[in-house]
C-alpha cells in the first residue's frame, strides 16, 4: 500500500492540514499518513475538536483509522468504499461545527449525503455558521455544487448545544470559477443574532455595522436580527457585500463586557478591509475554496494570501501533483490559478 505522507507541522501546521488531508484521502481513495501533528504547538498532537471531523469522514468512507485519539501525533487513514449516508457528529462541547463541515463538505461533494452536527455555531477561531451558509455555499453553487446548511439552534462558548443539519448532492457538473475582482458593490446584507440575551443586543450590533458601512459605501444595507434561546448566552454578527462577482464578508462575536456597538463596528470594519484590495474573494473564503477549485478549475483573486491558503494548496498537491499557481506574498492580495485540473 502506498501512503501519501504528510508532515502535520508544515506551514500553518494546525487542524486544517488534518481536515484537508483526510477529506482528499476520501475523495481520491488514497491512504494518508500524517505525522508530526501540530508539532510546533504548545500542546502537540490531536485535540478533541480534530477528532470529530476525522471520525465523521471515517464513517462516510468506511475507513480504517489508526491514531485517532487525543494527543496522538501520527494518524493513519485508509478509506474504504465511500457511500452516501446520514452522518451524525455529536460534539459535547462548544467545538466548532463549521470546522467539521470544512472536512465533510469537500468529501460529501463527491459522494453525496446528509449530516447532523451539534456543538458551537458561533465560536472563536472558526467561521460562523452564517458565513458558511451565505458566503461559502454561494461561491460553491457558482461552481455547480448544491448543498444546504440549516441552522436549527445556536451554540456559543463554553456550553455549545448548537445544532446544524444539511445535505450535499453529488457534484455532477463542475464549473470553473473565474472570480478575480469586483467592480461594484450592489448592496450589503447580514445577520445579527442574540441568544439568551435581550433583543436590543442584536439590534445595536446591526445598527452599528450599518452606520459604519454607510460611511464608506453608498449602497443599501439590510441586516436582519435574530433573537433565540439555547444552552448559554452569546451574540454575533456576519455582514457581507453583494458584489458583481462573489460575496465578501466580515464577522465579529460578542463577549461579556464588550458593547454591542463595538461588535457591529468590528464586523463592518473587517468587511471594509476585505473589500479594499478590490479582489473578488475574501481571505477566509480563499483557503476554503482550494479543495474544490482543484477539481473544478478556474482562478480567483483573493484579498489576502494567508498561511492557511498556502498550506491548503500544499496539502492538495501532495495528493494530486502540481495543481495551482499562487501569485503574491503571504499577507498581500494575490491570485490563485488552477494550472492542471484534477480528475477523480
Curated annotation (Swiss-Prot):
Native source organism of the sequence: Thermococcus gammatolerans (strain DSM 15229 / JCM 11827 / EJ3)
Family matches, as InterPro entries: RNA3'-term_phos_cycl_insert, RNA3'_phos_cyclase_dom, RNA3'_phos_cyclase_dom_sf, RNA3'_term_phos_cyc, RNA3'_term_phos_cyc_type_1, RNA3'_term_phos_cycl-like_CS, RNA3'P_cycl/enolpyr_Trfase_a/b, RPTC_insert
EC number(s) reported in the record: 6.5.1.4
Enzyme's top EC category: ligase
Residues that, per the record, bind ATP: 102, 284-288
UniProt keyword Cytoplasm present: yes
Family to which this protein belongs: Belongs to the RNA 3'-terminal cyclase family. Type 1 subfamily.
UniProt main location, coarse: cytoplasm
Signal peptide: none
Function of the molecule: Catalyzes the conversion of 3'-phosphate to a 2',3'-cyclic phosphodiester at the end of RNA. The mechanism of action of the enzyme occurs in 3 steps: (A) adenylation of the enzyme by ATP; (B) transfer of adenylate to an RNA-N3'P to produce RNA-N3'PP5'A; (C) and attack of the adjacent 2'-hydroxyl on the 3'-phosphorus in the diester linkage to produce the cyclic end product. The biological role of this enzyme is unknown but it is likely to function in some aspects of cellular RNA processing.
Subcellular location: Cytoplasm
GO cellular component assignments: cytoplasm
Active site: 308
Name the UniProt record assigns to this protein: RNA 3'-terminal phosphate cyclase
GO-annotated molecular function: ATP binding; RNA-3'-phosphate cyclase activity
GO BP annotations, alphabetical order: RNA processing
CDD domains in the record: RNA_Cyclase_Class_II
Keyword rRNA-binding among UniProt keywords: no
SUPFAM superfamilies hit by this protein: EPT/RTPC-like (SSF55205), RNA 3'-terminal phosphate cyclase, RPTC, insert domain (SSF52913)
Keywords: ATP-binding, Cytoplasm, Ligase, Nucleotide-binding
Reaction it catalyzes: a 3'-end 3'-phospho-ribonucleotide-RNA + ATP = a 3'-end 2',3'-cyclophospho-ribonucleotide-RNA + AMP + diphosphate
Amino acid at each position: 500500500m502506498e501512503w501519501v505522507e504528510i508532515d502535520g507541522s508544515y506551514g500553518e501546521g494546525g487542524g486544517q492540514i488534518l481536515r484537508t488531508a483526510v477529506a482528499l484521502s476520501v475523495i481520491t481513495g488514497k491512504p494518508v499518513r500524517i505525522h508530526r501533528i501540530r508539532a510546533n504547538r504548545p500542546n502537540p498532537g490531536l485535540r478533541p475538536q480534530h477528532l470529530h471531523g476525522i471520525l465523521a469522514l471515517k464513517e462516510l468512507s468506511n475507513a480504517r483509522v489508526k491514531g485517532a485519539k487525543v494527543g496522538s501525533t501520527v494518524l493513519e487513514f485508509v478509506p474504504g468504499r465511500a457511500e452516501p449516508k446520514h452522518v451524525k457528529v455529536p460534539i459535547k462541547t462548544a467545538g466548532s461545527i463549521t470546522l467539521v463541515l470544512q472536512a465533510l463538505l469537500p468529501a460529501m461533494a463527491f459522494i453525496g449525503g446528509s449530516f447532523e452536527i451539534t456543538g458551537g455555531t458561533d465560536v472563536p477561531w472558526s467561521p460562523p455558521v452564517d458565513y458558511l451558509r451565505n458566503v461559502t455555499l454561494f461561491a460553491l453553487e457558482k461552481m455547480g455544487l448544491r448543498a444546504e446548511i440549516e441552522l436549527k439552534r445556536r451554540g456559543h462558548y463554553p456550553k455549545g448545544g448548537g445544532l446544524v443539519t444539511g445535505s450535499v448532492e453529488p457534484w455532477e457538473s463542475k464549473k470553473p470559477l473565474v472570480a478575480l475582482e469586483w467592480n461594484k458593490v450592489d448592496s450589503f446584507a447580514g445577520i445579527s443574532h442574540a441568544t439568551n440575551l435581550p433583543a436590543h443586543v442584536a439590534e445595536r450590533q446591526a445598527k452599528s455595522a450599518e452606520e459604519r458601512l454607510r460611511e464608506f459605501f453608498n449602497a443599501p444595507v439590510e441586516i436582519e436580527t435574530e433573537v433565540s434561546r439555547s444552552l448559554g448566552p452569546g451574540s454575533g454578527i456576519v455582514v457581507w457585500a453583494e458584489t458583481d462577482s462573489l460575496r465578501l464578508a466580515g464577522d465579529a462575536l460578542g463577549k461579556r463586557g464588550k458593547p454591542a456597538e463595538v461588535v457591529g463596528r468590528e464586523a463592518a470594519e473587517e468587511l471594509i478591509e476585505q473589500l479594499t484590495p478590490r479582489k473578488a474573494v475574501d481571505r477566509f473564503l480563499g483557503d476554503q475554496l482550494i479543495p474544490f477549485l482543484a477539481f473544478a478549475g478556474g482562478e480567483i483573486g483573493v484579498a489576502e494570501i494567508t498561511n492557511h491558503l498556502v498550506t491548503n494548496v500544499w496539502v492538495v498537491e501532495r495528493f494530486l501533483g502540481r495543481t495551482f499557481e499562487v501569485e503574491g506574498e503571504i499577507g498581500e492580495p494575490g491570485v490563485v490559478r488552477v494550472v492542471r485540473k484534477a480528475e477523480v
